[in-house]
C-alpha cells in the first residue's frame, strides 16, 4: 500500500513539474513578440523599396524610401559583411 502511495506521489510531482515548465515556456514566448518582429523586419527589409535609396557615403544617403502597409522606412548607410552602402531599413513603428 505504501509503495502505491509513493508511486502516486512521484507521478503527481512529475506532472506538477511538467505543467509548470510548460506554463513557463508559454510565458517566455509571450514576453518578446514585438522585439522579435522588429528584429525580423530590420534584418529582412522585405517591405522596403530598395531602388529609391541611393547615395555615395555615410552621410550622403537619400531619404526616399517607401514601405508597404503600416511600416516606415528610412534610408541609411549599412555596413555589412557582404556589401556596404545605402539601404532602406524598415521599422515597425
From Swiss-Prot:
The keyword DNA damage does not apply. It comes from Conus radiatus (Rayed cone). It comes from the Eukaryota. Residues 1-20 form the signal peptide. Alpha-conotoxins act on postsynaptic membranes, they bind to the nicotinic acetylcholine receptors (nAChR) and thus inhibit them. This toxin provokes a nearly complete and slowly reversible inhibition of both the human adult (alpha-1-beta-1-epsilon-delta (CHRNA1-CHRNB1-CHRND-CHRNE)) and human fetal (alpha-1-beta-1-gamma-delta (CHRNA1-CHRNB1-CHRNG-CHRND)) neuromuscular nAChRs. This is Alpha-conotoxin RVIIIA. The keyword Metal-binding does not apply. Contains 5 disulfide bonds. Keywords: Acetylcholine receptor inhibiting toxin, Disulfide bond, Gamma-carboxyglutamic acid, Ion channel impairing toxin, Neurotoxin, Postsynaptic neurotoxin, Secreted, Signal, Toxin. One of its GO terms (cellular component) is host cell postsynaptic membrane. Expressed by the venom duct. Its main location: secreted. Coiled coil: none annotated. Residues 21-46 form a propeptide. The modification 4-carboxyglutamate is found at residues 63, 68. It is found in: Secreted. Belongs to the conotoxin S superfamily. GO terms for molecular function: acetylcholine receptor inhibitor activity; ion channel regulator activity; toxin activity. The cysteine framework is VIII (C-C-C-C-C-C-C-C-C-C).
Amino acid at each position: 500500500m505504501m509503495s502505491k502511495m509513493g508511486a502516486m506521489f512521484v507521478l503527481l510531482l512529475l506532472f506538477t513539474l511538467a505543467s509548470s515548465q510548460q506554463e513557463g515556456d508559454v510565458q517566455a514566448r509571450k514576453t518578446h513578440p514585438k522585439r522579435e518582429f522588429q528584429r525580423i523586419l530590420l534584418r529582412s527589409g522585405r517591405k522596403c523599396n530598395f531602388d529609391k535609396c541611393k547615395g555615395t557615403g555615410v552621410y550622403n544617403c537619400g531619404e526616399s524610401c517607401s514601405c508597404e502597409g503600416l511600416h516606415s522606412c528610412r534610408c541609411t548607410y549599412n555596413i555589412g559583411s557582404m556589401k556596404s552602402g545605402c539601404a532602406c531599413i524598415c521599422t515597425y513603428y
